[in-house]
Regions:
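Loop architecture of class A 7-transmembrane GPCRs
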Residues: 69-85, 114, 119-122, 131-179, ...
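Alpha-helical transmembrane segments of multi-pass membrane proteins
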Residues: 17, 47-59, 124-136, 173-174, ...
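Extracellular N-terminal segment of 7TM GPCRs
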Residues: 1-22, 26, 337
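Extracellular TM2-ECL1-early TM3 structural module of rhodopsin-like
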Residues: 2-14, 40-100, 105-115
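Class A (rhodopsin-like) GPCR signature focused on the TM5-ICL3 interface and adjacent 7TM helical core
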Residues: 94-107, 139-147, 169-203, 219-241, ...
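Helix-to-loop junction signature of class
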Residues: 13-16, 30, 54-70, 81, ...
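Seventh transmembrane helix
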Residues: 181, 229, 235-239, 255-302
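Intrinsically disordered regulatory tails of 7TM GPCRs
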Residues: 1, 194-217, 277-337
Length: 337
């Protein structure tokens, strides 16, 4: 890319980073304040928000340093790239955990609470992160591009092997979970729709339960679709580079693919805030509180200003009264000629 294109790219990266940090901190705060962390699904959502927050606070700043020409050792660059891969693998694992949780919620509604406890859900979250770390740091043990020099200009595709990205990440850790999640959500929608049709015109707890599950599943499917839409273009371009080395994939297209991947971490909080009722209500309460505090602060400032003005007017009136009294006494005390 030319220098102007590089600066446009870096500016967009920084905007996305700020959006990632602000949005995901808001989501984590909203889930925390509304007390939803006791529910397994929200444990997974918060963990996914943490992964997105790390993209904005760690990955994108590293990418910016790389793009402005930071030099580092080969294995230092490889370590940074493995962290980037780890967050993507962790996101896939957490999305799969959310899909399985929603499946169990619909498949075993009567025994769900005893089967999926808060403790077990956090154990699953920990397993997702540990597994992602173990699988993502495989390049550190040999599956990487040949070592070219003791120091290098750090570029992702300079150190990470296309074969590792395509065969291991894309074909093994991306497509199979995606197919499984698609099947689980299809089952969820078919089951909830069948239950709702069976209870048409009947206001029961069962009907309310399945309506709630259907709406939440639809919101989470949107998160999944956005994830696929943002990450798939980059994976496809990498696959083309592996299988068709004679086919030129423009570097600008790859950079746009990277931007899309990072954008996904900034878009998720918007989906949570507008589509998931508990998070939406918590965000509304936060907005009301901020707006109310601002109004109250403005009102206090106005009252203080009014009191100050009244005191000034009162002091001025007292001064005028005192001057008039002094003049009257002086006139009275003058001798009559």
């Amino acid at each position: 890319m030319g220098s102007s294109a590089v600066w446009v790219f870096l500016t967009l990266e920084m905007i996305i980073a700020v959006a990632c940090c602000l949005g995901n901190v808001l989501v984590i705060w909203a889930v925390w304040t509304c007390g939803a962390l006791s529910q397994p699904t929200f444990c997974f959502i918060v963990s996914l928000a943490v992964a997105d927050l790390l993209v904005g606070s760690v990955v994108i700043p590293m990418a910016v340093l790389v793009d402005i020409g930071m030099n580092t050792s080969f294995y230092g660059c490889l370590f940074i790239c493995c962290i980037i891969i780890m967050l993507e693998v962790a996101s896939v694992a957490l999305l799969l955990a959310i899909a399985v949780d929603r499946f169990l919620r619909v498949h075993i509604p009567l025994t769900y609470k005893s089967t999926v406890s808060k403790k077990r859900s956090w154990i699953v979250v920990a397993l997702c992160w540990v597994t992602a770390a173990l699988l993502s740091f495989i390049p550190m043990f040999g599956w990487h591009n040949p070592l070219r020099a003791d120091s290098t200009e750090c570029r992702f595709f300079t150190v990470i092997s296309y074969s590792y990205l395509v065969y291991f990440i894309f074909f093994s850790l991306y497509l199979p979970p995606l197919a499984l999640m698609t099947g689980l959500y299809c089952y969820i929608f078919l089951t909830t729709r069948r239950q709702l049709r069976a209870n048409i015109g009947v206001a029961t707890k069962s009907c309310t339960y399945y309506q709630k599950e259907h709406r939440l599943a639809a919101s989470l499917v949107l998160v999944l679709v956005l994830f696929v839409g943002c990450w798939l273009p980059l994976f496809l371009m990498v696959t083309v580079r592996l299988y068709g080395p004679h086919i030129e994939v423009p570097s600008v297209a790859v950079d746009i693919g990277v931007l899309l991947c990072h954008t996904n971490s900034a878009v998720n909080p918007i989906v949570y805030a507008f589509k998931i009722p508990k998070i939406k209500e918590a965000c509304r309460k936060l907005w009301r509180r901020v707006y109310h505090d601002r109004e109250q602060q403005q009102s206090e400032q106005n009252n203080t200003q009014n009191n100050t003005d009244r005191n000034k007017n009162s002091n001025a009136e007292n001064a005028r009264t005192k001057d008039n009294s002094t003049e009257n006494r002086s006139a009275t005390q003058q001798p009559v000629l």
